[in-house]
Regions:
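N-terminal amphipathic/hydrophobic interface segments
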Residues: 1-266
Length: 266
C-alpha cells in the first residue's frame, strides 16, 4: 500500500522519541512484513539524529494497544548518518537498532567525522551512539586534530563530550598498526592512545622509524606532546629476554632527544 507522495510518516510509540520518515517518491506500507518503505531522497529523523539514503525501510512491532513501535531502520545506497556529535558518510548499506542505539554500516569509503577527528573504513563501521564508541574494520584510518594518523586492520574509537565539544578519549588499534606524525613513523601489532596523557603505547613487533634509521623491540611509548619516544623491554618481562636494538643509517642518528628518541634498555 502506497501511503503518499512526497509526504512524511510520524511514529507511533517509540521509547527513544518519535521518528519521522520523509520521502520524495512515496512511502509504502508493507503490513504483512511489518515495515514501511520510503523511496527517493528518504530520511528518518528522531531528535538530533537523522538517517538519509535513497531507500529507507522501517521495521515495527505492535504492542498490546496496537500502537506501532519502530525497532529497526535500514538504509540503502548513499547513506548519511548525522547528529550533533558526528557525521557518517560513504555508506552503501546501514542498519540502526533503535533499542541498542547501534549502527552497522557497510561501504568502500565510509568516513566518520567528529569535530577535527576523522575515522575511515573501506569495509564496515560500527557505532554505539549512546556509548560513544565507534569501530572501523578493514583498511581503517584515524586522524586526530591533524596531530597524527593511525592505520590498522581495526580501530576502536572512544569519544567524549567536554566543554560542548566532542573529542577522542581513547583509541585502540589492532593488527598492522602504523602511526604517522610529522617526524616519525611507528609500527606495531597493537596500540593504545590516551588523550589525557597524549601517549600512545605500542605492543608487539614494534619498530620506530625516522628516515633510514629505526629501533626495534616489543614495546614502546610514543609521547605525542613532547615528541619523545621510548623503546622498552616488553611489560612484565623481568628477565628482559627481548632486547631492544637500533639500526642506524650512514648519516647517524639525531642525538637531540627532544626531536628523536629516548632509548631505555638494561
Amino acid at each position: 500500500m502506497k501511503i503518499s507522495e512526497s509526504q512524511q510518516l510520524t511514529n507511533f510509540d517509540n521509547s527513544n522519541g518519535p521518528i519521522e520518515i520523509f520521502a520524495d517518491d512515496g512511502i509504502e506500507w508493507h503490513k504483512n512484513k511489518s515495515k514501511y518503505v520510503a523511496l527517493g531522497n528518504a530520511k528518518a529523523l528522531s531528535g538530533t539524529l537523522s538517517v538519509e539514503s535513497d531507500k529507507i525501510e522501517a521495521f515495527y512491532k505492535e504492542n498490546d494497544s496496537s500502537n506501532m513501535n519502530i525497532t529497526e531502520v535500514r538504509a540503502k545506497r548513499n547513506v548519511v548518518v548525522q547528529d550533533k556529535k558526528m557525521k557518517i558518510t560513504g555508506g552503501e548499506y546501514a542498519e540502526y537498532k533503535i533499542l541498542k542505539d547501534y549502527f552497522f554500516i557497510n561501504g568502500k569509503n565510509i568516513t566518520l567525522t567528529s569535530e577535527k577527528n576523522i575515522l575511515k573504513s573501506n569495509q564496515k563501521l560500527e557505532y554505539w551512539r549512546s556509548k560513544n564508541i565507534a569501530i572501523a574494520t578493514g583498511k581503517a584510518e584515524a586522524k586526530k586534530d591533524n596531530e597524527f594518523v593511525i592505520l590498522a586492520d581495526k580501530l576502536v574509537w572512544y569519544l567524549q563530550e567536554r566543554n560542548q565539544k566532542t573529542t577522542v578519549k581513547k583509541l585502540l588499534g589492532f593488527k598492522n598498526v602504523s602511526i604517522k606524525t610529522n617526524n616519525e613513523v611507528a609500527f606495531s601489532d597493537k596500540a593504545i592512545y590516551n588523550n589525557e596523557t597524549e601517549i600512545c603505547k605500542l605492543y608487539g613487533n614494534v619498530k620506530l622509524q625516522r628516515g633510514e634509521s629505526f629501533l626495534i623491540g616489543e614495546y614502546a611509548e610514543v609521547d605525542l606532546r613532547s615528541g619523545i619516544s621510548k623503546l622498552l623491554p616488553a611489560p612484565g618481562n623481568k628477565l628482559n629476554e627481548n632486547k631492544v636494538r637500533a639500526l642506524i643509517d650512514k648519516g647517524g642518528i639525531d642525538t637531540d632527544e627532544s626531536n628523536w628518541y629516548s632509548l631505555y634498555c638494561s
